[in-house]
């Protein structure tokens, strides 16, 4: 009998980023505006009428002009894969055009060629919180069924353009986050306090249909390609062993499993039909929609930063006391500087839960520690960051990944989030830094944009070189 004792030989080690958080060049070479260009304080902050100087994402870290040097650094670490996104509004500036912007297409051609020249496979997210602003303002984003057609035109264009170059695709980043951040995730311009549950779940339905349609089209154009969904994953623990808390956990987890259930099984689960029925949510669902949904994904990818804890006792809930998406504080866990509770074992839990539920290959496409880094000189006079706290975080999580592989989980790869400093999604700041390469840019926008290797750079290089044996 074969036993899994460690990371497989073909394991895809790498790092991850998103176009809107690091490319910059927001109005260069014909690019249109996206929802990110009007959220200077992050996904949960206020929305401006247009781009404002305090929006760090407009310049990002200027990856658009510096990608060749950055890819060399990724290659030096030994990356097998690099996850990024295509900025939809680089390809279709408004989103509803029929003809694409050639300069935008050419940029990604050049980027993918550069990655492949360094033996790095591109892993590409089609929509990573980057809905063209015009589609948000004119159509109210994914609430409108027309979005499916616009997305179809976009994905057909990029699939045809990059077939043979990109074999790993994700349809939507953290697709379940639309329930918590409808503007950032779904381009929905209606304010959350006025957005009905019916319209919100109609937008969810449109995204699910579009995702399945992209999977169908992708397999037709690129039979060799692997197309996955991407969800925000957080295992949920009960605060107590009271049966009411156990039910609260079940209900909370279903809000997330719903998205992966549809992607993997190709149909709406019974518990969501009950939820719609009991909340008087009547969706516009056509027979054609139901047929399209049957186009299921090849693998499940997810982000993992934290677990969450649930209770049925409303008196135990305090505003801001839990993690990013609610819940209550877990008394057994420490938290990051941004209040995200750190739970390496939760990653093993979620890997096993996904595997037991679906028996589909899995891919960890985001994981990392957001922290304040201090640039200082080493003994040779070179600038670095002594980020042992980050090494400890990643080592603890990867140790649990190894345990999950021993449990029998089929895991394709791991891309740490923010392998180079970028503008954070939730708070739109530079000081919340993630992994291996420090970028000299400050929250006020000043800085040289010079790149410096952190201590974790060499640590991760060794992890990859030993295929996870040395953590």
What are these regions (language model features)?
Residues 66-87, 295, 299-300:
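Catalytic domains of carbohydrate-active enzymes, especially glycoside hydrolases
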Residues 10-12, 64, 81:
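A common structural microfeature
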Residues 1-51, 94-96, 105-471:
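Active-site region of glycoside hydrolase catalytic domains
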Residues 86-100:
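Glycine-rich, proline-tolerant flexible connector loops at the mouths of alpha/beta enzymes
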Residues 52-66, 143-145:
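Active-site mouth loops of central-metabolism enzymes
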Residues 80, 89-91, 129-131:
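A short acidic, glycine/proline-enriched capping/turn motif at secondary-structure boundaries
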Residues 65, 72-75, 106-109, 113:
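N-terminal, well-ordered alpha-helical segments
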């Amino acid at each position: 009998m074969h036993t899994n004792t460690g990371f497989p030989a073909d394991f895809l080690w790498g790092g991850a980023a998103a176009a809107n958080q690091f490319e910059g060049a927001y109005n260069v070479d014909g690019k249109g505006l996206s929802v990110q260009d009007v959220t200077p304080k992050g996904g949960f902050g206020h929305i401006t009428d247009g781009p404002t100087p305090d929006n760090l994402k407009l310049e990002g870290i200027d990856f658009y002009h510096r990608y060749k040097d950055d890819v060399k650094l990724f290659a030096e670490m030994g990356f097998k894969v690099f996850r990024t996104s295509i900025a939809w509004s680089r390809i279709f500036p408004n989103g509803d055009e029929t003809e694409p912007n050639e300069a935008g297409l050419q940029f990604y051609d050049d980027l993918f060629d550069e990655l492949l020249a360094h033996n790095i496979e591109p892993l590409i997210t089609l929509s990573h919180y980057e809905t063209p602003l015009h589609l948000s303002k004119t159509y109210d984003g994914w609430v409108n069924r027309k979005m499916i057609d616009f997305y179809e035109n976009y994905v057909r264009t990029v699939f045809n353009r990059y077939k043979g170059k990109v074999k790993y695709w994700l349809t939507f980043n953290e697709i379940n986050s639309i329930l918590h951040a409808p503007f950032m995730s779904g381009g929905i311009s209606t304010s959350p306090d006025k957005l009905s549950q019916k319209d919100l779940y109609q937008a969810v339905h449109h995204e699910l249909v579009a995702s399945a349609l992209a999977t169908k089209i992708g397999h037709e154009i690129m039979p060799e390609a692997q197309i996955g969904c991407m969800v925000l994953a957080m295992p949920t623990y009960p605060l107590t062993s009271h049966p009411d808390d156990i039910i609260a956990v079940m209900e909370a987890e279903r809000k997330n499993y719903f998205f992966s259930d549809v992607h993997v099984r190709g149909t709406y689960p019974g518990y969501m039909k009950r939820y719609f029925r009991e909340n008087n949510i009547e969706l516009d669902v056509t027979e054609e929609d139901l047929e399209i949904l049957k186009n299921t994904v090849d693998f499940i990818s997810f982000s993992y930063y934290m677990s969450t804890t649930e209770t049925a006792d409303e008196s135990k809930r305090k505003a801001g006391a839990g993690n990013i998406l609610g819940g209550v504080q877990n008394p057994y866990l420490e938290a990051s500087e941004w209040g995200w509770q750190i739970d390496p074992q939760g990653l093993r839990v979620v890997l096993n839960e996904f595997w037991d539920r679906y028996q589909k290959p899995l891919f960890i496409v985001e994981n990392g520690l957001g922290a304040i880094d201090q640039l200082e000189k080493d003994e040779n006079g070179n600038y670095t960051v002594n980020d042992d706290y980050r090494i400890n975080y990643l080592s603890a999580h990867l140790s649990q990944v190894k345990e999950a592989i021993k449990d029998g989980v089929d895991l394709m790869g791991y891309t740490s989030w923010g392998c180079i400093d970028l503008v954070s999604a939730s708070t739109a700041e530079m000081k919340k830094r993630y992994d291996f390469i420090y970028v000299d840019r400050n929250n006020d926008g000043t800085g040289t944009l010079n790149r410096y290797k952190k201590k974790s750079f060499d640590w991760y290089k060794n992890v990859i070189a030993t295929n996870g044996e040395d953590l």
